[in-house]
Regions:
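Conserved nucleotide-binding/hydrolysis modules and their immediate coupling elements
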Residues: 1-76
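Histidine-centered active-site/metal-ligand motif
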Residues: 64-70, 94, 98, 191, ...
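Functional cores that coordinate and move charged inorganic groups
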Residues: 86, 106-219
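Terminal appendage regions of diverse proteins
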Residues: 205, 211-303
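Short beta-strand-to-loop capping motifs
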Residues: 68-70, 126-130, 225-227, 303
C-alpha cells in the first residue's frame, strides 16, 4: 500500500481488451504511484485507489494514468493498494524472459526481437528460422541451473548520456522518454534496458518450463514458456487431467495414449459398420417399395 495525492481527474472512456462497448470513467493522475503502466511487453498492474478499482494503467509521457469509474477529487490524499498476485506473476514472467533471452543468445547466438507476456503463457520471438528439440532442452536445463544458483537481479538508473548505456542490451527508448535510463542486471549474465518489474533474485522464479516452439513471422521462431507459479499451476492442471483420464480409461497414466488410440480405432470401425448397415437397410426398403403393386411415383420414409 502507498499514500499519495490526486493531481488530476478527467472524464474518459476505456475500450475493454478484446473489444466490446466502451466503459465510461475517469483518467486519474497521482503524485506518485506503485502501479506499473503497461509497457515493454509487460501488462499493467491492477489495484485500488481507496476502495475504487483501477481497471487500466497506461503511460502518458512521464505520468502513469489510472482509469477508474468513479471521480476522485484533485488534491485529495488517497491510499493506493496493489494486486500483489498479479504483480508477482508478471515479475516472474518478465525476469524469466530476460534470463531466457540472455542464455539463448549466449548458447546459440539467437537474439530476441520481441516478446509477449500472455495471460496463460508467454512467447519470446527469436531471430532464427528454427530451433531443434535438443536446443530447447539444453536451454531449459541451463536457465534452471541459473535459478538454482540464486543469481542476484538488481536495478540501476543511469543518466541518459552515460557511456555505460552503450554496453546495455536495448531495443531503444520511447520517443517521449525523459529522465534517467533504467537498467536491469542479472549478475554476470545480462544488462538490459527495461522499465518493467522484476524479482530480486533468480531463485524467486522457482522454475522455468519451455513448452516448445512455433513458427513465427518473417523467418523467426516463437519460443513458448512458463515461469514460477505458472509452472506449478500447469502441473496441477495436468495432474487433474491425468486423474480424470485414469478414472475414465481404467488404466495407468503410462497407458493413456494407447488406450485412446484403441478407442479411436473402435469408433472408426463402429462408424464404418454403421454406414454399411444403413446402406443395407436402404436397399431393403427400396426393394420393399418396388414390390408393392400400387406404389406411386413419390415415396417418403420418415424415422
Amino acid at each position: 500500500q502507498f499514500v499519495t495525492k490526486v493531481v488530476s481527474c478527467r472524464a474518459a472512456e476505456l475500450r475493454p481488451e478484446g473489444g466490446g462497448e466502451a466503459l465510461s470513467g475517469f483518467q486519474v493522475v497521482l503524485e506518485d504511484t506503485i502501479l506499473f503502466p503497461e509497457g515493454g511487453g509487460q501488462p499493467d498492474d491492477r489495484g485500488l485507489i481507496g476502495d475504487v478499482p483501477v481497471l487500466r494503467v497506461t503511460r502518458r509521457g512521464p505520468d502513469a494514468v489510472h482509469f477508474v469509474q468513479q471521480p476522485l477529487q484533485p488534491g485529495a490524499e488517497v491510499l493506493l493498494s496493489l494486486d500483489w498476485n498479479r504483480r508477482f506473476d508478471h515479475m516472474q514472467q518478465h525476469s524469466g524472459q530476460h534470463l531466457i533471452t540472455a542464455i539463448a543468445e549466449q548458447m546459440f547466438g539467437f537474439k530476441t526481437t520481441s516478446w509477449e507476456l500472455g495471460r496463460q503463457r508467454s512467447v519470446i520471438e527469436l531471430d532464427t528460422p528454427s530451433m531443434s528439440t535438443e536446443q530447447v532442452e539444453a536451454l531449459e536445463r541451463r536457465v534452471n541451473e541459473k535459478i538454482r544458483e540464486r543469481v542476484p537481479v538488481t536495478v540501476r538508473e543511469l543518466p541518459a548520456d552515460d557511456p555505460a548505456i552503450e554496453t546495455v542490451r536495448s531495443r531503444g527508448l520511447p520517443g517521449d522518454h525523459v529522465g534517467p535510463v533504467r537498467v536491469v542486471d542479472i549478475e554476470g549474465l545480462d544488462s538490459n534496458m527495461c522499465c518493467g518489474t522484476h524479482v530480486s533474485n533468480l531463485s524467486d522464479l522457482q522454475a522455468i518450463k519451455l513448452l516448445g516452439t512455433e513458427k513465427g513471422k518473417k523467418n523467426k521462431t516463437n519460443l513458448v514458456f512458463l515461469a514460477g507459479n505458472r509452472v506449478l499451476k500447469s502441473i496441477e492442471q495436468s495432474h487433474s487431467t491425468e486423474k480424470a483420464l485414469t478414472s475414465l480409461l481404467k488404466n495407468g497414466p503410462g497407458e493413456h495414449v494407447e488406450a485412446v488410440k484403441r478407442l479411436q480405432s473402435s469408433v472408426k470401425l463402429l462408424q464404418k459398420n454403421n454406414l454399411t448397415l444403413l446402406r443395407d437397410v436402404a436397399v431393403l426398403i427400396a426393394r420393399d417399395f418396388k414390390s408393392q403393386p400400387d406404389h406411386r411415383q413419390l415415396f417418403v420414409l420418415h424415422r
